Regions:
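Glycine-rich phosphate-binding loop and adjoining beta1-alpha1-beta2 segment
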Residues: 1-20, 363-393
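A short, basic/flexible loop-to-alpha-helix module at the beginning of a structural domain
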Residues: 36, 124, 313-342, 349
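E1/E1-like adenylate-forming module used to activate ubiquitin-like modifiers
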Residues: 19-20, 24-32, 36-137, 141-150, ...
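Conserved active-site and cofactor/substrate-binding residues in soluble primary-metabolism enzymes
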Residues: 3-6, 10, 53, 130-137, ...
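Short, well-ordered alpha-helices that flank and scaffold nucleotide-derived cofactor binding pockets
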Residues: 13, 60, 144, 356-360
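A glycine-biased structural micro-motif
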Residues: 4-5, 155-158, 339, 389-390
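Metallocofactor- and cofactor-centric catalytic cores in central/energy metabolism, strongly enriched
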Residues: 232
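Glycine-rich adenosine-cofactor-binding loop
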Residues: 1, 131, 135, 139, ...
Length: 393
């Protein structure tokens, strides 16, 4: 029975049916629940997501993990398939560089303005033709990013295929002076932290890492509440805790409501409130944060906690299986493909179309992430679910 199964598991089963050599990891989770360390071993990845919020978090995850990636999607009203290519470097543009304040607000980000149209996470309307065209653009750029083919990846560009007019365009993305995705996460050296640091106090951790009062702390994906107000007495406070961990009002003991959430803060502002709390109040295994000195912002350092182990389903031994790929185009580097681990975030209609195109190649590993399950209304138009249901009889 396909209905009710996680989309990530459906995608995994399809990959295994057509490819018995690749290691596969299928994860059912919301991206905000995953630390960036999970993705650190990938050579390249694709964001195949509808939600602006999920795309924003995915971009920050890949910048922190230093994973080159493609953001694929459709502009349904214009019949455009699109793909944006990012090298995950501090001085290279990503898709978020072009987002307006309204788009960031719709993504659920705190930009200091109310947004009555914040996204719910539901998919955007499109057609299968658009999805498959966007998947083709993304698959080609993924192959180029990894060096699996000799083509030059279009890093820092957005590619668009107009299905109505049959026109293909590419344009270079502008590099914003201060991208909301915080490219500083991809800058500087990486310092690996011991797991025991999660049990230390935030003050001790920041002191060990060299943070001063004027140092900026940039959190990878989690946001802390910098300003909250009591729903009863109206007293305001700066708790600097996760929204899910807000405590009661210090004045009257009633519930606090979040007013301002931040991922970048000055340590001197937060320290008086949270320095004595455990580092786990902000961080988890696999998490990361950047410290940016006030006097030398170009000398940022990323500090990373070791990630929890990812459960890979091992593929079959390669042995002499190369003969099966004798008809692969000569432009494909089969030996290199066997060394590469890739990721696909999103296994809905677009992700399914992408996985169909990538699954037959004998990658070393493929990580698939999606939070949703297959619904009855999805089966007919979800290519992988329809195939598996047909195979099941």
């Amino acid at each position: 029975m396909i209905v009710g199964r996680p989309k990530a598991a459906v995608a995994r089963d399809h990959v295994r049916r057509v490819n018995r050599w690749t290691d596969i990891a299928a994860v059912q989770a919301d991206l905000e629940e995953l630390p960036p360390g999970i993705f650190a071993g990938l050579d390249a990845a694709v964001l195949a997501l509808d939600s602006l919020g999920a795309r924003f978090i995915g971009t920050r995850l890949f910048l922190t993990a230093r994973v080159p990636h493609v953001d694929a999607g459709v502009l349904a009203d214009h019949w455009h398939a699109r793909a944006t290519v990012s090298a995950a470097v501090p001085d290279g543009a990503c898709q978020v560089d072009t987002w307006s304040g309204t788009q960031l607000a719709r993504a659920g980000e705190d930009v200091g303005m109310p947004c009555v149209a914040a996204e719910t996470g539901d998919g955007a309307p499109s057609t299968l033709a658009m999805g498959h065209a966007a998947a083709a653009l993304a698959a080609h750029e993924l192959l180029a990013l990894t060096g699996a083919i000799a083509d030059r990846p279009r890093i820092g560009e957005e590619l668009r295929l107009d299905l109505r007019r049959g026109r293909y365009d590419a344009f270079r993305l502008p590099l914003a002076a201060a991208c909301a995705a915080d490219h500083v996460l991809a800058a500087g050296r990486v310092e690996r932290l011991d797991p025991s640091c999660l049990q230390a106090s935030l003050g001790a951790l920041m002191s060990t890492c060299g943070a001063g009062a004027d140092t900026s702390v940039v959190l990878a994906t989690r946001a802390v509440v910098a300003l909250a107000v009591c729903e009863a007495c109206g007293e305001s406070t700066g708790p600097y805790l996760l929204a899910s961990a807000l405590e009661t009002c210090p004045a009257c003991g009633m519930r606090l409501a979040s007013l301002r959430r931040v991922r970048r803060l000055r340590w001197g502002e937060a320290a008086p409130t949270v320095a004595r709390r455990a580092a786990s109040a902000w961080f988890r295994a696999g998490d990361a944060f950047a410290l940016v000195p006030a006097t030398e912002p170009a000398r940022a350092t990323l500090f990373a906690f070791p990630p929890p182990p990812l459960q890979w389903e091992p593929g079959a031994p390669w042995d002499g299986a190369a003969e099966r790929f004798a008809r692969l185009p000569k432009s494909f580097d089969l030996r290199r493909i066997r060394t590469l681990r890739i990721g696909v975030l999103g296994a809905g209609h677009l992700g399914a179309a992408l996985i169909e195109q990538l699954a037959p190649l004998p990658w070393q590993g493929m990580l698939i992430v999606d939070r949703d399950v297959v619904e009855a209304r999805n089966v007919a138009s979800h290519s992988l679910a329809a195939r598996l249901e047909e195979a099941a009889g």
